[in-house]
């Protein structure tokens, strides 16, 4: 599993976490940092062993290169010689060797499918696997599409073999799509065959007259991806009819002409595959504001393109991508609202058109200093949402407890906002916020104002290195602190807990919660 070195996230002791499976790191030798790897890739040294040539690699050839000093790995159809990278891999050589001489795509996806390996390993590229590519069908070939819909008998033929092999899951039916037009508009309709589809399950991008519409259905992704046959306006509308699971995307024509077909089918069009097997898609977003929140944490607000529909679900994260010294570096961050108080600051843009992040700047890091150097008006690439937190976990919850350390507070922002505005069963939501000093507390004033305004909300601050004037709680997460904090509103009330912070904080917190008789079903840990 190719885990590209990272200094900024999750750095040792970092508090900004995402929800995924954990992994172990091994100490790297001196001179084996990410910057050292980038310098090596730019040194001109032949890292492939092929003296600059690219080859087609058969399965038989790939299997031969399965030793530490001669290790080839296939990721998503491309073969890399990762022998030079062995000493730079923070997950250790043994992790890389698990995929030696084989297809490592699944192992790679288990941990860091978001890593931009194409950029990080481009100087190690040996070539492509010798696999006959699928021939894409367009609207002018063979089977004609009537209003975008094939007869059911032909539907399976349009899916790539690797897609049909994984579908359908027993409790999921493959979605389908149709389209129709008026003189001024084109409407694409996706039939998800699932109820309770919400707007944040739909991601739409219009780029250079190609339409990419993704519907996230449970743990699968359905994609409509076409090169439109005619030009359309960049503004469009998205509507979800939740009770029948129907999605409507309405495009406005630039010219009042009759379309003979929707357009040419592009990569993975009409596919329905597990979300973990999909690649990340990025769109360029513009930085519109940047303001200090604490001495080392800033609030970055980005504007989405007008031709994008993207709403990040509660408790989920996205990936930010920047070019650093010529290499593309990707880091995960959890979006937040621009304020905890609706009238604290009037938003300058529609909430559906901008996305904000609370990000701690690490002066010695690689990514965050580069991010901090961005000027208003500059652009940064933002992926679609990722993460396994579902608001369905909060159904009928009466007592919600949030445990956060440092910037582990970020996923709690949307959870807190959702709880206070959408949970009719909620009696109490309590936040215990751990920091080093008073100066490190993010949005302290807003949290205190919210507690005064909202009778269901309480916040407690805990400092590990307080000033002599501090009158609040002190120390680190402990059984004594949690026992006092985790008081239910009634003896049999339904409770749920979220915890996020540095890995040792989260691990210890979950252990203590188990000791206090909270079950796994009552706990969600945002861990890296």
Curated annotation (Swiss-Prot):
Q: Which residues carry this modification: N-acetylmethionine?
A: 1
Enumerate the residues binding FAD. 372-387, 399-431
Provide one Gene Ontology biological process annotation: cell development
List the SMART domains.
Answer: Cyt-b5
Q: Which residues bind heme?
A: 89, 112
Q: Which residues form the CS domain?
A: 172-263
The gene for this chain is: Cyb5r4
The answer to keyword Chaperone applying to this record is no
Q: What cofactors does this protein use? A: FAD
What InterPro entries does this protein's entry cite?
A: Cbr1-like_FAD-bd_dom (IPR008333), CS_dom (IPR007052), Cyt_B5-like_heme/steroid-bd (IPR001199), Cyt_B5-like_heme/steroid_sf (IPR036400), Cyt_B5_heme-BS (IPR018506), Cytochrome_b5/Flavoprotein_Rdt (IPR051872), FAD-bd_FR_type (IPR017927), FNR_nucleotide-bd (IPR039261)
Residue ranges crossing the lipid bilayer per the database entry: none
Recorded GO cellular component terms are: cytoplasm; endoplasmic reticulum; perinuclear region of cytoplasm
**Compartments where found:** Endoplasmic reticulum
- This protein is called Cytochrome b5 reductase 4
Q: Which domain of life is it from?
A: Eukaryota
Looking at the keywords, is Heme present? yes
């Amino acid at each position: 599993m190719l885990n590209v070195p990272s200094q900024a996230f999750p750095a040792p002791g970092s508090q900004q976490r995402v929800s995924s499976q954990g992994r172990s790191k091994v100490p790297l030798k001196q001179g084996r940092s990410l910057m050292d790897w980038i310098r090596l890739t730019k040194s001109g040294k032949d890292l492939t062993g092929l003296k600059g040539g690219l080859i087609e690699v058969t399965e038989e050839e790939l299997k031969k290169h399965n030793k530490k000093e001669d290790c080839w790995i296939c990721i998503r159809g491309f073969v890399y010689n990762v022998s030079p990278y062995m000493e730079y891999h923070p997950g250790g050589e043994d992790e890389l060797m698990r995929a030696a001489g084989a297809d490592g795509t699944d192992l790679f996806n288990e941990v860091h499918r978001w890593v931009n390996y194409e950029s990080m390993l481009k100087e190690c590229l040996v070539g492509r696997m010798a696999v006959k590519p699928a021939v894409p069908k367009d609207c002018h070939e063979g089977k004609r599409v009537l209003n975008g819909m094939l007869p059911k008998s032909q539907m399976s033929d349009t899916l790539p073999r690797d897609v049909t092999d994984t579908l359908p899951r027993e409790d999921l039916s493959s979605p389908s799509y149709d389209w129709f037009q008026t003189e001024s508009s084109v409407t694409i309709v996706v039939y998800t065959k699932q109820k309770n589809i919400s707007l944040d399950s739909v991601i739409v991008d219009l780029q250079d007259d190609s339409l990419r519409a993704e519907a996230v259905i449970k743990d699968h992704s359905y994609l409509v991806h076409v090169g439109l046959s005619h030009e359309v306006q960049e503004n469009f509308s998205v509507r979800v009819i939740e009770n029948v699971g129907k999605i409507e995307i309405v495009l406005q024509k630039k010219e009042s002409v009759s379309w003979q077909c929707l357009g040419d089918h592009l990569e993975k069009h009409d596919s329905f595959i597990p979300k973990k097997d999909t690649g990340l898609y990025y769109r360029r977003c513009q930085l519109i504001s940047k303001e200090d929140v604490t001495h080392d944490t800033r609030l970055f607000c980005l504007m989405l393109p007008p031709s994008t529909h993207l709403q990040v679900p509660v408790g989920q994260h996205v990936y930010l991508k920047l070019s650093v010294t010529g290499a593309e570096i990707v880091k995960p961050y959890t979006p937040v609202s621009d304020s905890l108080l609706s009238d604290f600051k009037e938003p300058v843009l529609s909430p559906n058109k901008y996305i904000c992040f609370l990000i701690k700047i690490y002066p010695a890091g690689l990514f965050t200093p580069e991010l901090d150097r961005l000027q208003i008006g500059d652009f940064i690439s933002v992926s679609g949402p990722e993460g396994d937190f579902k608001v369905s976990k909060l159904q009928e919850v009466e007592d919600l407890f949030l445990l956060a350390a440092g910037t582990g507070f970020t996923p709690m922002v949307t959870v807190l906002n959702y709880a206070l505005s959408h949970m009719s069963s909620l009696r109490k939501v309590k936040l215990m916020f751990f920091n080093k000093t008073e100066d490190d507390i993010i949005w302290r004033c807003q949290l205190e104002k919210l507690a005064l305004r909202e009778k269901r909300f309480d916040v407690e601050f805990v400092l590990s290195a307080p000033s002599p004037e501090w009158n609040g709680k002190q120390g680190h997460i402990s059984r004594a602190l949690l026992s006092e904090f985790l008081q239910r509103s009634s003896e049999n009330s339904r409770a749920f807990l979220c915890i996020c912070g540095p890995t040792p904080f989260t691990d210890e917190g979950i252990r203590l919660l188990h000791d206090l008789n909270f079950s796994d079903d009552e706990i969600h840990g945002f861990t890296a």
